[in-house]
Swiss-Prot record:
The keyword Metal-binding does not apply. This is Olfactory receptor 4A8. It is a multi-pass membrane protein. Glycans are attached at N6. GO terms for molecular function: G protein-coupled receptor activity; olfactory receptor activity. Pfam families: 7tm_4 (PF13853). Residues 1-24, 81-95, 161-193, 257-266 are extracellular. The gene is OR4A8. Residues 46-57, 117-139, 215-235, 288-315 are cytoplasmic. It comes from Homo sapiens. The chain crosses the membrane at residues 25-45, 58-80, 96-116, 140-160, 194-214, 236-256, 267-287.
């Protein structure tokens, strides 16, 4: 339950107080946001519209792209608008809402990457039973589990912040409401709360990252035992997923696998995994996947010159 406090709004410092720098950042982040939304929604629509992309991996890819689009919308529009404002403020309820939604979709993204790694494991190690194991009901169940995991983690984060008192100051040294900058403003000792946040966020992030690396190692090792062609494809077969895992988890590990503290570089690392990575997602999958490229070309009205059914796989 929230304790009494005299804070009704927070002031976000953002990146810079210089107008010229703010204008340049406004243009840059606006373009990034537009590209992010167009790219991710293009993947979602292409997968829904294409009769050839019915494999479970594309179902999860569409979900990942949709979540990335929503996740980016949680942060980028506020950042873009604030760059045009002299006083960057956010109300207490809006700040709590942003914190909850950001963690909800960010954590769902993390769990969905685990689900996609499992999907690739089944497709590679049990190809004859792939469609039987990864049937429609299982895919929906795995998606629900990913969303539930993100929801529970977000509830914990919001309860931690909401239950502690804010007495001032109300200046957040960040461009949005994030957990560590908010804990710095609490009027009580947050040492043990910080340890709980590290365990809940950082440790889980590290464990999942390690499990993902192990799973990709198992997949690559399994591919090498198949045939000369399998050995040739081994370095590339799951590269799209692996690249996304590295881009997302490395900044998160640096930010959350440590005691509660804030550094100037935190803002730039947060931009990388919350603004840049969702933009890169569609390009990585389009460049690494010929089926995805063909589906987008067909959606946009281009003739790919190829017909017929193609086995669904990422390469």
């Amino acid at each position: 339950m929230r304790q009494n406090n005299n804070i009704t709004e927070f002031v976000l410092l953002g990146f810079s107080q210089y107008p010229d720098v703010q204008n340049a950042l406004f243009v840059m982040f606006l373009l990034i946001y537009i590209v992010t939304m167009v790219g991710n929604l293009l993947i979602v629509v292409s997968i829904i519209a294409s009769p050839f992309l019915g494999s479970p991996v594309y179902f999860f890819l569409a979900c990942l792209s949709f979540i990335d689009a929503v996740y980016s919308t949680t942060i980028s529009p506020v950042l873009i608008v604030d760059l045009l404002c002299d006083k960057k403020t956010i109300s207490f309820p809006a700040c709590m809402g942003q914190l909850f939604i950001e963690h909800l979709f960010g954590d769902t993204d993390v769990f969905l990457l685990v689900v996609m790694a499992y999907d690739r494991y089944v497709a590679t190690c049990k190809p004859l039973r792939y469609l039987t194991i990864m049937n429609r009901q299982v895919c929906i169940l795995l998606l629900v589990v990913a969303v539930t995991g993100g929801f529970l983690h977000s509830v914990f984060q919001i309860l931690v912040v909401y239950s502690l008192p804010f007495c001032g100051p109300n200046v957040i040294y960040h461009f949005f409401c994030n957990i560590y900058p908010l804990l710095d403003l609490e009027c009580t000792d947050t040492y043990f709360v910080g340890l709980a946040v590290v365990f809940n966020g950082g440790a889980i992030c590290m464990v999942i990252f390690t499990l993902l690396l192990i799973s990709y190692g198992v997949i690559l090792n399994s591919l090498k035992t198949y045939s000369p062609e399998g050995r040739h494809k081994a370095p590339f077969i799951c590269s799209s997923h692996f690249i996304m895992v590295i881009l997302f988890f490395v900044p998160c590990i640096f930010l959350y696998v440590r005691p509660v503290s804030n550094f100037p570089i935190d803002k730039f690392l947060t931009v990388f995994y919350s603004v840049i990575t969702p933009k890169l997602n569609p390009f990585i999958y389009m460049l690494r996947n010929s089926e995805m490229r063909n589906a987008i070309e067909n959606l946009l009205g281009y003739q790919s010159g190829k017909t017929g059914f193609r086995c669904s796989k990422l390469n």
